[in-house]
């Protein structure tokens, strides 16, 4: 089973947002949700991930991207990773509010079919860590963890 190390030994994976094919307001929305997910990771681990826009390729990274309606309209980073990994994204391309959650040893790829699908994919990380959607409104405190892994099964 493939496991992606989101947090271990006081170190979290960085979050990389591919915004090359996004309108500015959509990019702001994706970044805002990425910040909320970072806060959820911090609630569980005590360490807040860094958000960036380019791959490091030497450390674990969560890559977030909105796919275009066609492969010609994908973001540059998404297109590169899809080609590099020979991924089939046809299951979500052109659909509404869908996402792919792809786990590799060094990357967790979250590809959304649109902005909302990408947001759902990012919040899936919080859900898998055991963070309640009520954490902000009802002071529901998530359980602290020494290690956080994402697996290919979710």
Question: How should these model regions be labeled?
Answer:
Residues 1-154:
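Contiguous, structured surface segment used for ligand recognition
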